[in-house]
Regions:
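Short, Lys/Arg-enriched N-terminal segments with co-localized hydrophobic residues
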Residues: 1-6
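Cyclophilin-like peptidyl-prolyl cis-trans isomerases
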Residues: 28-213
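Bacterial N-terminal signal peptides
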Residues: 7-11, 15-28
Length: 213
């Protein structure tokens, strides 16, 4: 090999190494981007009740504040031993706030309403219960036994935030909805009151736990 050829090879080598390094970096960035674009799997929880099990998928991507709040209550064991205290057939079942003696459990501060996520209160969806104040939801939730679109956000009017849906156990929801109900005395944070639509026999939420991804 001539001296000229050796010099050319010496000059070319850094360029080849630079091109190779650039290709490796580009490939690494592409792989990282592809991984970041992978959809994050929504968390799931199992609600065990005296009438059967209900599995829920939570919409962490659409209702992040509400899901985080709910999961904190789950992790704290807040729902264990509470009841479905309000059951209205062909409407919804509501629970997560009162023990078997209908005494309200203490909660953290309420959260902001996320009903602008435009998720609909269709049959089988999980939504936050609240008072007339849109930003008053804390721990109580309900499962829509039928589609209740009038509860949705509409025309600037806040609705009831949907943050999950039943993926297994809707038959249990239907069974609960058919239970005999009546009036019962309850102890709320604001004092004693009388509730309507309380199951004659308590339907207890034995536990709510996260499911492995």
């Amino acid at each position: 090999m001539t001296e000229m050829s050796m010099r050319n090879m010496t000059n070319l080598l850094p360029r080849l190494l630079s091109c190779l390094l650039a290709a490796v970096l580009s490939l690494s960035m592409s792989v990282a981007q592809a991984q970041s674009d992978d959809p994050v799997e929504n968390p799931r929880v199992l609600i065990k009740t005296t009438d059967g099990d209900i599995t829920i998928e939570l919409f962490a991507d659409k209702s992040p504040i509400t899901v985080e709040n709910f999961l904190q209550y789950v992790d704290d064991g807040h729902y264990d031993g509470t009841v479905f205290h309000r059951v209205i057939s062909n409407f919804m079942i509501q629970g997560g706030g009162f023990d078997t003696e209908l005494k309200e459990k203490p909660t953290r501060d309420p959260i902001v309403n996320e009903s602008k996520n435009k998720l609909h209160n269709t049959r089988g969806t999980l939504a936050m219960a609240r008072t007339s104040d849109p930003d008053s939801a804390a721990a109580q939730f309900f499962i829509n036994q039928r589609s209740n679109l009038r509860l949705d956000w509409s025309g600037g009017k806040d609705g009831y935030t949907v943050f999950g849906e039943v993926i297994d156990g809707m038959d249990v929801v239907d069974i609960i909805s058919l239970t005999d109900v009546g009036r019962a005395h309850a102890q709320t944070a604001y004092g004693p009151t009388v509730f309507q639509d309380v199951p004659a026999e308590p339907i207890v939420i034995l536990s709510v736990t996260r499911l492995a991804p």
